[in-house]
């Protein structure tokens, strides 16, 4: 009897040890999972989610926009005139509402393809139409889904009132046979905490002319350790939350711009690389940039520079002189 009880006790102890080891193994695995475009801890199902890239209107009448706070990466570039548009790339978080959605340009398609995203837009330029209809990308065009998977907000007028959602994007993808799961190649991120600058720096980016004002400002909050953005003196907020949009990396890159038609549409050289300014932790680093497989990445002395884990905003400008740096107030 005693022998039998001893055997049972040993088996029970063995079972407990094995159970504890299995429980410990799950968190260890989970700790290694990072969102590919933010470098932040996440879940397995998130790492398998295909990115979505949405062309978002940045006309003054379109502000504040919806969904920008959930984008992992936002790329800002000129469309026609001195008005910019955003390419908002979502992967770790998906928007319940995103917009106003605007029309495609060829360079936005190229940038979207760098992440193998589903490309979401409402309308297109002749060049982008030819590009997309030739199979350059999986896309969802608001012209095909206006009134169904895109809706018109009643607080604004066209073309500043077209919106969609991730649920509707998924429905369109299923209708068109696009994959919704994939492994996304990660960006390069810092693996250790970098020291913030003793003196933090802010930056202004002037997309305007003598007749048109389009001034973007990024200000660093030392206490919160992120940047906020403003357009023409008004803080950039997310319409859905009312809160300022925050980011950890600001990357300003110079690329050649050329007017290509009588409507003022542009071609932007995303192949040649050039000069850049990288803002992180209040610091500013003079860099170069390269386009690698459709992605704009910072390079210094021939080596890629890592991003700070978090969200990244990239501003493409015709001339780096559009950026002016100033000391922060140490908030």
Swiss-Prot record:
It comes from Bacillus subtilis (strain 168). Disruption phenotype: No PcrA-related phenotype. It is a lipid-anchor. The gene is yerB. Interacts with PcrA. The interaction is not essential for cell viability or repair of UV-induced lesions. Keywords: Cell membrane, Lipoprotein, Membrane, Palmitate, Phosphoprotein, Signal. This is Putative lipoprotein YerB. It holds the Pfam family DUF3048_C. It is found in: Cell membrane. Residues 1-19 form the signal peptide. InterPro entries: DUF3048_C, DUF3048_N, YerB-like_sf. GO terms for cellular component: plasma membrane. The modification Phosphoserine is found at residue 103. The lineage of its organism: Bacteria, Bacillati, Bacillota, Bacilli, Bacillales. Coiled coil: none annotated. A lipid is attached at residue 20 (S-diacylglycerol cysteine).
């Amino acid at each position: 009897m005693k022998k039998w009880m001893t055997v049972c006790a040993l088996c029970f102890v063995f079972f407990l040890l094995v159970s504890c080891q299995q429980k410990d193994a799950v968190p260890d695995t989970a700790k290694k999972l990072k969102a590919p475009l933010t470098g932040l801890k996440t879940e397995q199902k998130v790492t398998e989610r295909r990115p979505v890239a949405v062309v978002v209107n940045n006309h003054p009448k379109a502000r504040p926009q919806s969904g920008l706070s959930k984008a992992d990466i936002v790329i800002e570039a000129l469309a026609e005139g001195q008005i910019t548009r955003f390419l908002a790339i979502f992967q770790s978080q998906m928007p319940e509402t995103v917009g106003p959605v605007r029309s495609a340009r060829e360079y936005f398609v190229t940038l979207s393809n760098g992440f193998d995203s589903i490309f979401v837009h409402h309308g297109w330029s002749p060049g982008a139409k030819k590009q997309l209809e030739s199979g350059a990308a999986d896309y969802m065009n608001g012209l095909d889904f206006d009134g169904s998977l895109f809706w018109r907000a009643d607080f604004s007028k066209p073309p500043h009132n077209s919106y969609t959602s991730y649920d509707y994007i998924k429905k369109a993808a299923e209708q068109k046979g696009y994959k919704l799961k994939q492994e996304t190649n990660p960006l390069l991120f810092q693996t250790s905490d970098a020291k913030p600058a003793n003196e933090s720096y802010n930056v202004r980016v002037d997309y305007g002319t003598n007749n048109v004002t389009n001034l973007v400002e990024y200000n660093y909050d030392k206490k919160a350790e992120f940047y906020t953005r403003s357009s023409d003196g008004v803080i950039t907020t997310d319409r859905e939350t009312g809160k300022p949009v925050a980011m950890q990396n600001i990357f300003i890159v110079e690329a050649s711009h050329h007017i290509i038609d009588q409507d003022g549409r542009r071609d932007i050289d995303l192949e040649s690389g050039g000069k850049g300014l990288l803002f992180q932790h209040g610091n500013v680093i003079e860099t170069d940039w390269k386009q690698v497989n459709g992605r704009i990445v910072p390079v210094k002395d021939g080596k890629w520079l890592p991003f700070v884990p978090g969200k990244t905003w990239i501003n493409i400008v015709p001339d780096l002189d559009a950026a002016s740096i100033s000391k922060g107030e140490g908030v």
